[in-house]
A protein has these predicted regions:
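Extracellular carbohydrate-recognition regions
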Residues: 28-55, 217-218
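Short carbohydrate-recognition loop motifs
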Residues: 47-72
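Secretory/extracellular carbohydrate-interaction modules
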Residues: 66-124
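Short, aromatic/His-centered strand-loop micro-motif at the edge of beta-sheets
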Residues: 125-147
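Localized edge beta-strand/strand-to-loop motifs within extracellular or lumenal beta-rich domains
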Residues: 144-158
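Flexible glycan-contacting loops in extracellular carbohydrate-active proteins
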Residues: 169-204
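Extracellular beta-strand elements of beta-rich domains used
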Residues: 203-210, 562
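Asp-box/BNR beta-propeller blade signature and adjacent active/binding-site loops
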Residues: 215-572
Length: 572
């Protein structure tokens, strides 16, 4: 695991988070100082992503050293109040557009932008251009420690180098300001998140701390399941998470062997855990077609037989998405299926089912990503459902993008094309509603919209109503996951869970809850507030919740395991 936490009081912070989860608020401690790196040492409150060395390793006896792209040291918590002071004492081994800087609420405050080495900032407040504040020359020198102070008070931010104010920003946003929901539970609202990154520099960190007048909200701890750059795999992407009938956790992913591209030598792989996520097996290959694309895993378990099915898609590594042809030829996208009867240890030879799973005028095609479902109620109880998407290229007509469903009524032996949505939707997941309807929640594609698309089927996924945009589910045009946590009974409401990067850009992975079958989403938790993308949810047999998610620019796929769900209203 490449993410490291400071040691010492992890248990205390974990218990605080569980308290928050159950709706118990910790005491507010005004003026609290939160030390992330103190005297060159990572504290129990900080975490790193990527390579680092510690004070005393011979590189520097007094500093924590962070090196390279996609390497961060961040606060292992969020802060309720946005009124805060961020302080860092650091040095860079070089200047020259290194990209090193301080992250504050989705904005980067950097030290040497461009060839002229200017101090500046970038992020939503500044639009598509970088804001230049001052010249680095005379203020920052290579291998010379300097002090950075960022102070936010009632939305007014000041940026100082060595005590000199170099920049000011009015109306600076809090961390969660862009979540468009007035009824979200208070436990997830964050005023501030922060991190340091090295990028193209060797960043020596002598001190990194936050002073805040509000409460500190620890983030859930995570475990890395797939680390990009490990073994023989350049990049792992596209997670799917499933619990077998026996309770085994199966974490699927694409293993992109020689590059991070969507078109490469890609295999579908899985790792297994028989102890609730504590330990994991080695990687098992599910589907490998030489050096071609064999990915987009969409697994589903048949609860009546215990068989685990995995559907995925294939294309030649020489054919990019925009080059895929309609039909079923060698230049087209094809659908394959495999299964396991021993809880995911071994997998049958994959079978091509394209003829029954794809229409002639479809070109691009993707299963999932994420797990499928088995219907539990109504006329179609037992039906297996696989969410998919495709691009349609009808002869003489415009190309359009749609979500659709594959279904099986004979325990996975045969598959049929079911409901299709209207144009403008893409990757999707399905969930069964209390009345047996099937709801499809879809990513937007090809339209200027940043809200999830929602479609309803009243016949088990064979036809859809026209879809609607859900203004409570903001998205950056990215895959998301939706799952049923529990059914309603006489004592408690049913619960749906939804996870995605909850802004217009790919960060702030949130887990939300609905108690009215997706009409509203009044409760939410922050899972990971930094760079993130695809995710998948699973509900453990004991009621705990697992979220498998991409993070840190696809450098890893992590698993967060959370306690059983208790709405704020139940625990007040």
């Amino acid at each position: 695991m490449d993410m490291e936490f400071g040691m010492g009081k992890q248990l205390t912070w974990t218990l605080v988070f569980v308290g928050l989860w159950l709706g118990v608020s910790p005491k507010v401690m005004p003026g609290m100082e939160y030390g992330i790196i103190v005297d060159g040492k990572l504290t129990q409150h900080g975490a790193i992503v990527g390579r680092s060395t510690r004070a005393g390793d011979g590189i520097d006896d007094q500093a924590f050293v962070l090196k390279g792209l996609y390497k961060f040291v961040y606060a292992g918590a969020g802060f309720r109040s946005s009124n805060a002071r961020i302080h860092a004492r650091i040095s860079l081994n070089q200047l020259g557009n290194t990209g090193a800087g301080v992250l504050v609420n989705g904005h980067w405050f950097t030290f040497d932008i461009g060839p002229s080495n200017q101090i500046g900032a970038a992020g939503p407040v500044f639009g598509k251009t970088t804001k230049v504040f001052a010249e680095a020359e005379g203020r920052i020198q290579p291998d010379t420690p300097f002090d950075v102070d960022i102070v936010i008070q009632d939305g007014f931010l000041t940026y100082a180098i060595n005590g000199e104010t170099v920049g000011e920003v009015k109306n600076f946003p809090s961390a969660m300001e862009t979540v468009p929901s007035k009824d979200v539970g208070s436990v997830h609202k964050l005023g501030l998140i922060t991190a340091l990154r090295s990028w193209r520099a060797d960043l020596k960190i002598y001190d990194f701390r936050v002073e805040t007048d509000g409460e500190i909200i620890p983030l859930p701890e995570t475990k890395t399941i797939y680390q990009s750059g490990s073994a023989r795999t350049n990049t792992y992407r596209i997670p799917a998470l499933l619990a077998s009938k026996q309770g085994t956790l199966l974490a699927f992913a694409e293993a992109r062997r020689n590059s991070g591209s969507d078109t490469a030598d890609i295999d579908t792989v899985v790792r297994r855990s028989e102890d609730g996520g504590k330990t994991w097996s080695d990687e098992i290959t599910v589907f490998d077609e030489q050096d071609n694309v064999a990915g987009n895993p969409c697994p589903v378990v048949d609860q009546s037989t215990g068989r685990i099915w995995s559907l995925q898609t294939w294309n030649s590594h020489q054919v990019h998405e925009n080059q895929t042809k309609v039909g079923f030829g060698k230049d087209s996208r094809r659908v394959f299926i495999t299964y396991s009867d021993d809880d995911g240890k071994n997998w049958a030879k994959a079978k091509d089912i394209t003829a029954s799973a794809k229409e002639e005028h479809w070109s691009w095609y993707a299963t999932g990503p994420g797990a499928g479902i088995q219907l539990q109620r109504g006329k179609h109880k037992g039906r297996l459902i696989i969410p998919c998407d495709h691009k349609s290229l009808p002869e003489g007509g415009p190309q359009t993008y749609h979500s659709h469903i594959l279904f099986s009524d004979d325990h996975g032996e045969t598959w049929h094309i079911g409901a299709q949505t209207g144009h403008g939707l893409n990757e999707c997941e399905a969930v069964e509603l209390e009345n047996g309807d099937v709801m499809l929640n879809s990513r937007n594609h090809g339209v200027d919209e940043f809200y999830r698309g929602v479609s309803i089927s009243k016949d088990g996924g064979q036809t859809f109503s026209s879809f609607r945009r859900d203004p409570k589910l903001l998205e950056p045009r990215c895959q998301a996951s939706i799952r049923r946590y529990r059914w309603a009974d006489n004592h408690q409401p049913g619960v749906l869970l939804f996870s995605n990067p909850a802004r217009k850009w790919r960060d702030f992975l949130m887990l939300r809850a609905s108690y009215d079958d997706g009409k509203t989403w009044p409760d939410a938790r922050v899972i990971y507030p930094y760079t993130t993308a695809y995710s998948d949810i699973v509900v453990f047999p004991d009621g705990r919740i697992g979220i498998l998610f991409e993070r840190d620019n696809h450098t890893k796929i992590d698993l967060a395991i959370l306690p059983s769900w208790s709405p704020v209203s139940e625990s007040d």
